[in-house]
Amino acid sequence: MKRLFTLPFLATSLFAQEPNKDIKEGHSHNGHAFNEGPRQEGPLMRSTGNVHLAITSSWDKGQAYFNQGLGQLHGFWYYEAERSFRAILAHDPNCAMAYWGLSQANYENEKRAKEFIAKAGELLKKEDFKISDHERAYLNAEVAYHDDKKEKDATKRRKNFIRAYEDIVLNNPEDLEAKALLVCRRWQFNRKGIPITSHVGMDAILEQIFAKNQNHPAHHYAIHLWDYRNHKQALDSAARLGQTAPGIAHMWHMPGHIYSKSKRYQDAVWQQQASARVDHKHMMKWFLLPDQIHNYAHNNEWLSRNFSHLGMVRASIDMAKSLLGNPRHPKLNNPGRGSARYGRRALIDYLEKAELWQEALETVNSPWLEVLSKPEDDLSRLRLIGVAQANLGQQVELRKAIEGIEPHLTKFKVDQEEAKKTAKEKAEKEKKKEKEVKAAEKKAHDQFQKNIKKFENVVVELKGYLAAMNGDFKTAKEALSKRPSQQSPVLRHLAYGDHEKAAELSKAQIDKKDKQTIVLAKAIHALYHAKKDDAAWKVGFEDLRKFGSEVDLESPVFARLAPIAKELGYPADWRIAHKLAGDLLPRPNLDELGPLHWTPPPAPEFSLPDQHQKKVSLSEYRGKPVILVFYLGAGCLHCTEQMTAMADRYSDFEKSGLSILAISTDDITNLKDSQDNYSKGDIPFPIVSDAAKNIFKQYTAHDDFEDQPLHGTFVLNAKGQILWSDISADPFMDIDFLIKESRRLVSLHK
């Protein structure tokens, strides 16, 4: 719908505003909320879903971009939804529904959502502001939802929001988007204290949508709705969802939930691969860090897990390493969160599960599994060392592993006693009652107890293995009862001579029919050797053949089944080819969707002049890693702070084998000012001019919506690939992190 009035400034886009000198270079002129999110305009993708909600916009492409953003909202692709809605505002700053879209895209970021919808609220207050009643209903609902001054009770605001959307549906029964968003928020609010009273009722609303548009992306909400209630009800949606919005990775991911719960691991893996590939292709195009993408790390960890369930040992470990090889960022991804956390946990888990003991020992002393500063975070790596040494029969090395863990346990206990003493003395000094003194002591005690218990369990487990190596199976069994082996209790019972227990656990595992190949293979092996006359191991092997079509036959877990397979008369390759289920729709070729693993994208080449008009080319740095710093000229004070910090630490960069090249928005004549700003002589790295900002734009260090450059820091490897980046309203100032992460990534992506 075209806006029915014209204002003198209507044709003025956001990026044409007069600069405000009080705003820092790189910061948005439209408010703090605009400093985050995408700041580069993208094309119409035409792969984000067949959706439509009529809006009022003076821009001829406004409706198309709004529909794209709406489809991205349905796919929880919030980052890209912002890009679509910002594109509208860059051409039509009075499009209230674009602000609605930005607010919706920040459902999980209340502060930014309120800032965006407040902009729409200002427009609504204008007497001559003309939009449809339909749009006004959407906007009023969003404004009221975020108005915590008028209604402080968040639960009431959520209930009012649901009622407002019900009214939109009642007044506009053909509005499929209102119905879809109603179901979406109803499911989301279920997690916020407003339980769904009727899943069937919500599903009936979805069926109304699908009756009009069979391939509406609301299949996404059908999967969420039924995921934990009755997953089989969402099998049709699982088959369709990816094709409804093929450009959105999350829409390929979600069917994996349903197929995993249905134990259809081949189908789950296909979906999760599709999701990973679409994500990787997109992030490489836009120089995005993997963890900027919603649910990216969750998808790829689950993919690694399902690879393991299928017995695809190498694929499982490679995906775990892929997560660890992703670039890290202080705001997104570190050993305690995101890709790094998922990858570390998965790699340690699957090396042990697949019994790759030698590879495990090689990996724990490599950049893949670096030593973490906190002992409690590093415990899983330390434990893996001990488990691997035990399984390799290395008694001396196992003792060393135990001796490497015990001092941490001792320190936790000492610190616990010291904390209790301090807490007691403090409480007594404050003349607290005896009950309060004991409570203070207990609080101090409890903050250490979790870590103490974790370390005690590992020490008990490893000492049990050591006892078994010395023939003391009584102690080994006691340890096993206190601390069951995380991965292979059946094999431990078998090794300790407790065949009855090994047979009992193995048979129970075979009877579960959970289709997890590695666990089943161990159960078959254990039952065969513990109680061969029990035919359950034969049944288990026949099951394994049917759903183990992808297992790595040379992996230790499956290789030891070869004699059993021969005894049963199976061929050397005993796997039976997998047959696709009949409820699947046609699928695209996976390779066409993108690469399976994140691959550093090639850095755009350039050749720019320095202050002496000498051309400096990126190609000159080929063969060695380099850090590119995009800074906004000598007049930018916080840019100068970054340049000074990097110049002061230049020797540390050199020791790490890292060169630095700075690209400035200054013209050649003003480049010298940057040198003059540095009080300690000449800046020890080259500075080149990109006054036209062409290279800034190629590296996406540019706000296309407001036509201004952004701060950017990039790490390139010797092959000229972008390993890491930070593009922001502010320069990246954590120099220690930059050096450490650059070293790590360069070592992993040579």
Ranges and model annotations:
Residues 8-16:
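Hydrophobic h-region of N-terminal signal peptides that target proteins for export
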Residues 18-219, 231, 243-245, 263-274, ...:
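N-terminal alpha-helical interaction modules that lie
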Residues 66, 97-101, 180-181, 220-221, ...:
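Alpha-solenoid helical repeat scaffolds
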Residues 549-605, 619-622:
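N-proximal helix/coil linker or "cap" segments that precede and/or mark the start of modular domains
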Residues 618-646:
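Short active-site neighborhood of thiol/selenol oxidoreductases, capturing the structured segment around
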